[in-house]
Regions:
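Conserved "HGTGT" condensation-loop signature of ketosynthase/thiolase-family condensing enzymes
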Residues: 1-53, 57-59, 64-66, 72-161, ...
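Glycine-rich phosphate/pyrophosphate-binding beta-alpha loops
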Residues: 161-167
Length: 185
């Protein structure tokens, strides 16, 4: 788990908008101490979402016609090709298997189908990362490798290191992804 989170930390270290821009080792992340107290076994503070941040993000959506009218350069345009919405039961006690997420599996398969692409067509990924287990479950359900150095599971550095401003983390993910896609479509 520490190695997984160290990879997230390394991405955050290169993210100019991340809250924690120091690349931490697996040992630093896992070792419990005064600055990294145990929150809930097996996760110390550095494996939990960091919501004590002062951040914001925004995305402006408009038609291509409006973008042309506003003279937004075409190389700044990013098009969403598909989207889905799914959720597992909110009550953890009602879930059949805590290590699975039918919603992620079904929603992920459907969005790829709607976009007409496969996982191998995707270079950039950002998996919701409130805790390592959320990343492990999502990666498993989507068929993503946990240790793929060529395709990290985050573009921001995740909620621990990039910052998790309560309900706005995904907006940070989308905004960062838009920048990444402009650089490398």
């Amino acid at each position: 788990i520490g190695d997984l989170w160290a990879r997230f930390s390394a991405v955050a270290a290169a993210n100019p908008n991340a809250w924690v821009r120091e690349s931490l080792t697996a040992e630093q992340i896992c070792e419990v101490g005064p600055d990294n107290r145990m929150i809930s076994w097996p996760y110390p503070k550095l494996m939990n979402s960091n919501n004590m941040v002062d951040q914001s993000a925004a995305v402006v959506l408009c038609s291509a016609e409006k973008a042309e009218y506003l003279q937004i350069p075409r190389d700044q345009w990013v098009f969403p090709h598909a989207g889905t919405d799914s959720h597992d039961t909110y009550s953890i006690a009602e879930r059949d298997e805590l290590h699975r997420s039918p919603a992620i599996r079904i929603g992920g398969a459907r969005v790829l189908e709607l976009a007409g692409i496969g996982l191998d067509d995707i270079d950039h990924v950002d998996v919701y990362s409130c805790f390592p287990s959320a990343v492990q479950v999502a990666a498993r359900e989507l068929g993503l490798a946990l240790g793929d150095a060529d395709r990290p599971l985050t573009v921001t550095g995740g909620l621990t290191f990039a910052g998790g401003p309560w309900n706005n983390y995904v907006m940070h993910s989308i905004a960062t992804m838009a920048h990444r896609l402009r650089e490398n479509p």
